[in-house]
Amino acid sequence: MAAERKGGFTRGKGLLEPYLARQRASRANRLIPAELRAGCILDIGCGSYPYFLAHTAFKDKFAIDQLPAAVDEGEIHWHTLNLNKEPSLPFDEAFFDVVTMLAVAEHLNPASLVNLLGEVHRTLMPGGRVIITTPAARADGLLRWMARIGLVSAEEIGEHTFAYTLPLLGWYFGRVGFGMERVHFGYFELGLNMWATADR
């Protein structure tokens, strides 16, 4: 969710960061139904270089991050917002077809995440989808070790607030109004990362 170096993938340095960003983007793209791409997407916590939005096809693209864009992405409608302080999304109800939160949840405390998911539910169109990726809780210690030796960004890992599990994400989805029969989960990157989708 934090800002990134110009032309980079994540804030700070890490040998594996470009690979991990590409993996998240690839996973998210595979989880988006083709029929939704004719509408609007919002990427929450996209970073100041919006790698995923630059590598996905949608009619209209919107971005939220806590710092301004570091590069000129003319096709992206940019909004600067710190979601830990202000969880309300500045959009009308049923505005988006897809909302993505890639490597964002771990930067939010549970109360902020629940509030944000409520806003996501409000702004999704009926039939729309939210997609989340976040490190598995069991990967937390490994990620901190990888940050110490320069494989992943120490700045990003240092800002991880909470380590989530798939059952907990599912409970949060249900709490804000998503039907559990429309929630799906899985792992990738050898079980160290998780994805979750919920359809409104």
For each predicted feature, which ranges?
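Conserved N-terminal segment of class I S-adenosyl-L-methionine
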Residues: 1-92, 98-100, 114-117, 162-163, ...
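S-adenosyl-L-methionine-dependent methyltransferase catalytic module, highlighting the catalytic core
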Residues: 7, 11-18, 22-23, 98-101, ...
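Hydrophobic adenine-recognition pocket in adenosine-nucleotide-binding enzymes
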Residues: 104
